[in-house]
């Protein structure tokens, strides 16, 4: 049964994602943690990088190794990447 808002029906879709939070993780430890997370994760999943450009580079490097894709969670928060599987076609 759809929910209603102002008399208009709408449907809510919630996707539960696994999250890796890299706040407080040293750059030299991050790559191992990201590999371990990606290996075990189901997709889509989130990786919170914070605003560190170096941490974002590390995350993107690992994501490329697995031929995965990522995008920012939203335009306001560029400290969180959503990682998705690469689909050919």
Predicted regions and their residues:
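Long, charged, low-complexity intrinsically disordered regions
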Residues: 2-89
């Amino acid at each position: 049964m759809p929910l209603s808002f102002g008399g208009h029906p709408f449907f809510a879709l919630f996707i539960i994602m696994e999250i890796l939070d890299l706040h407080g993780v040293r750059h030299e430890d991050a790559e191992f943690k990201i590999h371990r997370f990606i290996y075990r994760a189901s997709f889509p999943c989130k990786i919170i990088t914070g605003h560190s450009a170096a941490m974002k580079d590390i995350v993107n490097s690992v994501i490329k190794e697995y031929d995965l894709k990522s995008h920012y969670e939203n335009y306001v928060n560029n400290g969180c990447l959503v990682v998705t599987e690469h689909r050919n076609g």
